[in-house]
Amino acid sequence: MAEQQAQAQPQLALERIYVKDMSLEVAGAEVFTKEWQPELDINLATTAEPLDEDHYQVILTVTVNAQNAGAAAFIAEVHQAGIFLIKDIPEDQVGQILGAYCPNILFPYAREVISDIVTRGSFPQLLLAPVNFDQAYAQSQQQVTDGEGNA
């Protein structure tokens, strides 16, 4: 009886982390004949989808476009995924968890994969700077709020 009256405890756990997809596309061999002074364009995107009542798949996509001497050098991309248990957590907190907490967990793994595939492609090591997903999530929510106010 006491068990039934006890309130369910919130649960949040990473159950699995994996690389869903990764690729490195090298523009051509001529890229290796020029002095390496790259210009990088780095894009991040996060998607989340429920798998069942208590599990979500979160995918952090990191895409790096590198140009050298005005020409394309490579495109490196990883889809780093995780399966998260999110149970008995208030609905108003789930968005923050999926949009900030989970990507914070996934990013170091994605960063390592990007560094590895770029190095295996015979380019100098590429270390991505840390990302503040909490701030990015807050900004995206502010844009949504501002957009609703202007509608």
UniProtKB/Swiss-Prot annotation:
Q: Which UniProt keywords apply?
A: Chaperone, Cytoplasm, Protein transport, Translocation, Transport
User: One GO molecular-function annotation for this sequence?
Assistant: unfolded protein binding
| Pfam families the UniProt entry points to | SecB (PF02556)
Query: What SUPFAM superfamilies does the annotation carry?
Result: SecB-like
A single Gene Ontology biological process assigned to it is: protein transport
Query: Where is this chain's protein located in or outside the cell?
Result: Cytoplasm
This protein's GO cellular component annotations are: cytoplasm
Q: Which NCBIfam families match?
A: PRK05751.1-4, secB
- What does the subunit section of this Swiss-Prot or TrEMBL entry state? Homotetramer, a dimer of dimers. One homotetramer interacts with 1 SecA dimer.
Role summary? One of the proteins required for the normal export of preproteins out of the cell cytoplasm. It is a molecular chaperone that binds to a subset of precursor proteins, maintaining them in a translocation-competent state. It also specifically binds to its receptor SecA.
Q: Which family does it belong to?
A: Belongs to the SecB family.
The protein depicted here goes by the name: Protein-export protein SecB
- Name the gene that codes for it: secB
